[in-house]
Amino acid sequence: HGVFRRQRQMCIRDRYLVRKIFTKQLRQESDLTQALMFYVCSLSSRLIVYKGMLTPSQLFPFFPDLENKSFETHLAMVHSRFSTNTFPSWDRAQPCRYMCHNGEINTLKGNMNLMQSRQGKASSDLYKDKIKKLFPIAEPDCSDSGSFDNVLELLILSGRELPEAVMMMIPEAWQNDQNMSKAKKDFYQYASSLMEPWDGPASIVFTDGTQVGAVLDRNGLRPSRFYVTNDDKVIMASEVGVLEVAPDTVVRKGRLQPGKMFLIDFDKGKLISDEEIKKEVANQHPYGEWNKNQIIELRDLPESPKKKLVSDLIPKMKAFGYH
């Protein structure tokens, strides 16, 4: 199983590299007048992304295979929303390759600039000298969702698990939380030195095909509600009533709290709580020790020696015409 997984990950990374090279050549470097109409929706062995500037009622007539009863899936991630932050276009329609989201990323410009600045020092044991072919990581002409998806994809395909990557990008308000465990604070402090928060009112749903989950921004400014039914269906949406659910079939319901995560792992066959997810991530490495050895606080730096001003400095300055 371990060998197969490594080979599968290599194959996924190879497809990622090919897609990035081809996309850059066509969308950014070619002279084609309609180059931005080209967009690779998924190129995945696990997921198929259906994309279109459609209303919900137009989806099934446009993609009739979705109505075929032999077409089965264990998850579906659906997005229906007007474009509010960018000019609407087919390639910007959601879902993206790994996520879809309700809200906006207010820190986008800073996030994009910092991702650009990191490229000069980027290195990878997985991509070696080919890593420059992945640049720019956050592609131009994307929406805030598309840029977030680009960076999330890089983190996942560089070896991080999906929940860890999402925690790095959408952290909790951890600095002054007296009830948060030290291990989790240590993780967030370590992660903050690698990746600044992608902040803003946002409810983000994410999947890699083996896990699907959701996270709410740390201010809790977007709703996310869920139902769990007695036939093992989980329905999460930005509001109640998106799908009809008989009340007597509901075994659990609730809403995401600010900064909290909701995750289903299909390999393990279970719904995993926020506490369990983050405890596992926070304890996978000695983050506290790494922080102690690598982070230098300003208050710990030695003070510069204090020197007294020469008593006749001011008269001399005036003598030389200083005012």
Predicted regions and their residues:
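Amphipathic alpha-helical
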Residues: 36-66, 159-188
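Active-site-adjacent "gating/activation" loops or surface patches in catalytic cores
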Residues: 65-91
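Short, glycine-/Ser/Thr-/acidic-enriched flexible segments
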Residues: 55, 82-84, 104-106, 111-113, ...
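Phosphate-interacting basic helix/loop segments used at nucleotide- and nucleic-acid interfaces
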Residues: 182-202
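Conserved catalytic micro-motifs used in adenylation/nucleotidyl-transfer and phosphoryl/amide-
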Residues: 76, 89-105, 109, 196-236
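Conserved catalytic alpha/beta cores of large enzymes that bind or transform nucleotide phosphates
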Residues: 106, 112-189, 240-323
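Anion-coordinating catalytic cores for phosphoryl-, nucleotidyl-, and glycosidic chemistry
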Residues: 80, 87-88, 193-197, 216, ...
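Single conserved hydrophobic/aromatic residue that forms the stacking wall/gate
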Residues: 1-12
